[in-house]
Amino acid sequence: MNPSVKKKRVIHQYREGQFTCKTDEVVEEFPLTVIVNGEEFVTLVCSPDHLKELVIGFLASEGVIRFENEIKRFTIDESMGFAYVDLVHSSEFQSSDFTKRVIGSCCGKGRHFYFLQDVKTAKTAIDRINISADTCMRLMKSLQEESQLFQHTGGVHNAGLCDTEKLFITRTDIGRHNALDKIYGYCLLHQIPLRDKILVFSGRISSEVLLKAAKLGVSIVISKSAPTELALNMAEELNITTVGFVRGESFNIYTHHQRITE
């Protein structure tokens, strides 16, 4: 665990009718401003680890890049909180394209997206992957066992990428979207294909989280928490299996149940 992501702090804890003084661990919160082609693009408030993965994953999720080799230069000044990105095809980047809200359509039905780039980058999932109910629960258990920073602080979200057998990468962050972007960035940097992968997640499956999963291209999203109705509507259209409330020996399948077998 990167020591920069948490700090020790003396606190006064009230329990069973009395105060005691103790040392607790608290997560760090770090603002990182991303400069693309000399222009301020976004400030990400994040946990200060795996920052290159975070920036690359975020840019890919937003449709700024598709592959890591579209970046000509990349530098991070952690002391000042800046990441500098120069694109190979700089003339194709227009920051104004990333602030336009849009309602797109698919197969004759209205599909709601937040921004124009969501229409371009969300992928419809493939059908060739399926897992057993036991695997569903085992993958969630593996994510929880790997989540040391959460166990120490209780202040982060956890995300993991799996194949049909095992969990092979995990990332944590104070922002649930950041944890997903770190995974996306890692996969781009290491050229890991995503179309046959499964996303395991600690937080609520909101519409934004579902869109992140669709942009990765995963077919199954597994969470220990609840989904939202808008997220489930999107999952239906994008052919994504959503599994929520994975706790102990039970869970709920909300969409495209055919991928989860007994």
UniProtKB/Swiss-Prot annotation:
Pfam families: FdhD-NarQ (PF02634). It is found in: Cytoplasm. The active site is at 107 (cysteine persulfide intermediate). Coiled coil: none annotated. GO terms for cellular component: cytoplasm. The keyword Transport does not apply. The keyword Cytoplasm applies. GO terms for biological process: Mo-molybdopterin cofactor biosynthetic process. This is Sulfur carrier protein FdhD. It comes from Bacillus pumilus (strain SAFR-032).
